[in-house]
Amino acid sequence: MNFLVTLAFEPGFFGSEPVHTALAVGGGAALVSGVVGVFTVMRGQSFAGHALADVSSAGGAASFLIGINPLIGFLIMAIMGAGGMELIGARQARERDLVTGVVLGAGLGLAALFLYFDVTSTSTTGAAITVMFGSMFAIPASMIPLALAVGIGALIAVAVLFRPLLLSSLDPELAAIRGVRVRVVGFLHLLALALAVSLSAITVGAILSTALLIGPAAIALRVAKRPGWAVALSALIGVGVTWGGILLAYDSYYWTPGRGWPVSFFVVTLVFVLYVISGRAGQNRERIAARDLGEA
């Protein structure tokens, strides 16, 4: 047993403060993304999640420019992006995609401008890499309270909205008949989504945060038979792949001394592998069920 622990955990892992911070912030972000992600997939708003993550990158870039907490920048722009989607408004799925694309383009334009100023006007030459791909081991411990507060806020919002959000995600027309204010619930979900992508962007970067939002949720919905179980499983998978990615990234410093691999790479790779495995398992389960039905 001790041999396995020594093999998996390189020296100093449990005593490293950057690792502690990464585990706390990354785990919290993954938990929130896993919960919110299930409803995002069920509502067919994966593109909106991707768009808000990219829009939030403008806030991350601006935060480096003016010297504030990057998470605040991500949050402000993600919330503004959600507000923009709701303000322009659209009822049909195709129109929602058009609105999302417009907001995405505007956000990326601002991100390009702010990153240009970061590189040319300040000394933050690594801002683009940090904003787009994350730097989990560089997250300061002082960010933990704000990250946890944002995560708790998003989880409380989902808990309060759970039943109407679930009903409106499965059948919007039935939800409206039963008195659910579908558009209000949809906007509140967008706000929770903005909080989730902001947290994931600060950990694995704006570009790759969609994998942490959509991947665990898609896997869970393939495996679980009930929405409640899917939410719990998605959160568990998200935390598992994030902590696993942190461990592998830390160990990678010993594979190629002085040149570790990014956490985001391992997180996305683990999500992809689990998604492929879940698809294979689902196909095998369907074949077995069809065979049993034929024999009956």
Regions found by a protein language model. Give the residues of each.
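Helix-loop-helix "hairpin" substructures at the membrane interface of multi-pass membrane proteins
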Residues: 29, 143-216
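Short loop segments and helix-boundary regions at transmembrane helix junctions
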Residues: 38-122, 220-235, 248, 252-256, ...
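Membrane-interfacial amphipathic/re-entrant helices at transmembrane-helix boundaries
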Residues: 1-30
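Cytosolic-side transmembrane-helix boundaries in multi-pass membrane proteins
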Residues: 252, 259-296
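Hydrophobic alpha-helical segments embedded in the membrane of multi-pass proteins
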Residues: 31, 35, 53-57, 79, ...
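Hydrophobic alpha-helical transmembrane segments
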Residues: 23-28, 71-76, 98-102, 144-149, ...
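Hydrophobic core segments of alpha-helical transmembrane domains in multi-pass membrane transport
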Residues: 26-34, 60, 82-83, 108-112, ...
